[in-house]
């Protein structure tokens, strides 16, 4: 089995369905003998360019270990899901379990917001 990093972008109107989508994709991988090493929900972010007249979208990153058949099934699911605007699958050499640089940035932004809210409350 090989290791893969998958990033997919979801339509912002479908953001509330992201946890269900993640569970569906995780169950697809695990039911066929694969493993999910890391799941990161990066949240709603600004797009680099307009996609379908949208400026923002919901980003999700998943690191998995699976076979070719499972990967083909996932790619098929991404292609025919209208809520998924774009997806990228990259083969990696080893399983990534540490937080990605993007997730660290998301955590920093959340910490700044929390600090600003606590200052306003005080």
Curated annotation (Swiss-Prot):
GO terms for molecular function: small ribosomal subunit rRNA binding; structural constituent of ribosome. Gene3D superfamilies: 3.30.70.60. It holds the Pfam family Ribosomal_S6. SUPFAM superfamilies: Ribosomal protein S6. Keywords: Ribonucleoprotein, Ribosomal protein, RNA-binding, rRNA-binding. Residues 95-122 are annotated as: Disordered. GO terms for biological process: translation. One of its GO terms (cellular component) is cytosolic small ribosomal subunit. InterPro entries: Ribosomal_bS6, Ribosomal_bS6_sf, Ribosomal_S6_plastid/chlpt, Transl_elong_EF1B/ribsomal_bS6. It comes from the Bacteria. Binds together with bS18 to 16S ribosomal RNA. Belongs to the bacterial ribosomal protein bS6 family. HAMAP family: Ribosomal_bS6. This is Small ribosomal subunit protein bS6. It comes from Ralstonia nicotianae (strain ATCC BAA-1114 / GMI1000).
């Amino acid at each position: 089995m090989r290791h893969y990093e998958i990033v997919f972008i979801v339509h912002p109107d479908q953001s509330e369905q992201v946890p269900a989508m993640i569970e569906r994709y995780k169950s697809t991988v695990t039911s066929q003998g694969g493993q999910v090493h890391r799941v990161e929900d990066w949240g709603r972010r600004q797009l680099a360019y307009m996609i379908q007249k949208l400026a923002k979208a919901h980003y999700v990153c998943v690191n998995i270990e699976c076979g070719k058949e499972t990967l083909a099934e996932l790619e098929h699911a991404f292609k025919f899901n209208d809520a998924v605007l774009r997806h990228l699958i990259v083969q990696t050499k080893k399983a990534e379990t540490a937080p990605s640089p993007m997730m660290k940035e998301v955590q920093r932004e959340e910490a700044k917001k929390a600090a600003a809210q606590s200052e306003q409350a005080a």
